[in-house]
Design a protein with these regions (language model features):
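N-terminal small-residue-enriched
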Residues: 1-194
Length: 194
């Protein structure tokens, strides 16, 4: 907390009260009022998310992220509506600024390795960009992988437009499924694609 984990243009939030979606609620499963947590502000890590137990162990206030699949399950700290905040760039200007890259569409899943700070996400397809213009070359599916900190620090542009889609699910292995939302603005960054 208090350290740089991303470029200056990165602002990230989580919270059941941050937008209206399938992952929104008034109180978490610990009875804590839902809120909007500013995780990263101008590239600096502000805080994490927590349930009551983890907040007590860390000596912090709970963030309203105590969630469980059903009454039969234990409460864990879980994401809700996690997204990047809007930036100042138009998607058109972002595309024009790219010599060679891909415009990725239809993000559909992801997973992280919290011990090694690695991430892997997939997109339904990507449209190749050459000399600032979209081409007719489409690749599908696209896997995005790499170090979370490297990816966050590579973000140089963030679009003004933000779109949140609220019908995702997040699980812990093969169990503990809860509703989550994804989306956000378009980001210009560098990552390994395959």
């Amino acid at each position: 907390v208090g350290k740089r984990v991303a470029s200056d243009v990165v602002n990230m939030y989580d919270g059941a009260a941050s937008c209206v979606s399938a992952a929104s609620y008034f109180f978490d499963d610990d009875g804590v009022e839902a809120g909007k947590t500013n995780i990263i502000k101008n590239g600096i890590l502000q805080t994490g998310i927590s349930d009551c137990l983890s907040a007590m162990e860390l000596g912090t206030a709970p963030t309203g992220n105590g969630r469980r699949e059903s009454y039969k399950r234990k409460v864990y700290t879980r994401m809700t509506n996690t997204f990047f905040d809007a930036g100042n760039d138009s998607v058109e200007d972002m595309i024009k600024s790219i010599k060679h890259g891909y415009y990725l569409c239809q993000s559909n899943n992801g997973m992280e390795d919290p011990k090694n700070w690695q991430i892997q996400c997939t997109a339904g397809y990507g449209i190749e960009i050459v000399d600032g213009k979209l081409t007719d070359h489409i690749v599908a599916p696209v896997v995005i992988s790499g170090s979370v900190v490297d990816l966050l620090n590579s973000i140089s542009m963030v679009s003004k437009d933000v779109h949140i889609f609220g019908m995702g699910m997040c699980g812990k292995g093969h169990k503990e499924w809860v509703f989550v939302s994804d989306g956000g603005p378009y980001l210009k960054g560098k990552a390994k694609l395959s």
